[in-house]
């Protein structure tokens, strides 16, 4: 039995703008999603083929996609609108054999204070045989310039035989410092394709590391 939250998710104008920037959404999407805002779950929806479960041992969620799932997507944006909010979140993705799905992630920070706001996201992917994932991740920051916006994304991929993952990562603007780490192991005939776009507006430090 899947979970469906038929609710009016309450977001202020700042959060709505962040959601549009990082997920391209003007409203709550159809299908599976998990929206996190200032350290708490703002809204969640699952489908018959995509389940989302809150972790019990640390901060984060498990996204479980059934074998053979095609033409479905899941959105998991993170919004920080309180100055000084800092978090480390662990999201694990389990993609069943033969599935072909799109995953849209990303984080938006609004910081109009003097404190540092930071989001460290650790995303681990487990792709079964012949599974395919298009993974889109966007980072965006804004504020009055007095407090720093920091994001440190880490992506770990485990691809079984014939699996394919395409990563599209975009740092839009407004991030002061970021370290991106990508690690993975690929079985026979598996492939990983990475596209990274970085805007250097306000960026003071950027580093990308890959270990494949």
What does each of the following model-derived ranges do?
Residues 1-100, 104-114:
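N-terminal leader/transition segments
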Residues 100-101, 110, 131-133, 163-165, ...:
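Extracellular beta-strand scaffolds
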Residues 110-114, 142-147:
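Acidic/polar low-complexity surface segments
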Residues 117-129, 150-154:
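Surface-exposed loop/turn motifs in large extracellular/passenger domains
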Residues 148-204:
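Loop-centered beta-sheet repeat module
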Residues 202-212:
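Single conserved hydrophobic/aromatic residue that forms the stacking wall/gate
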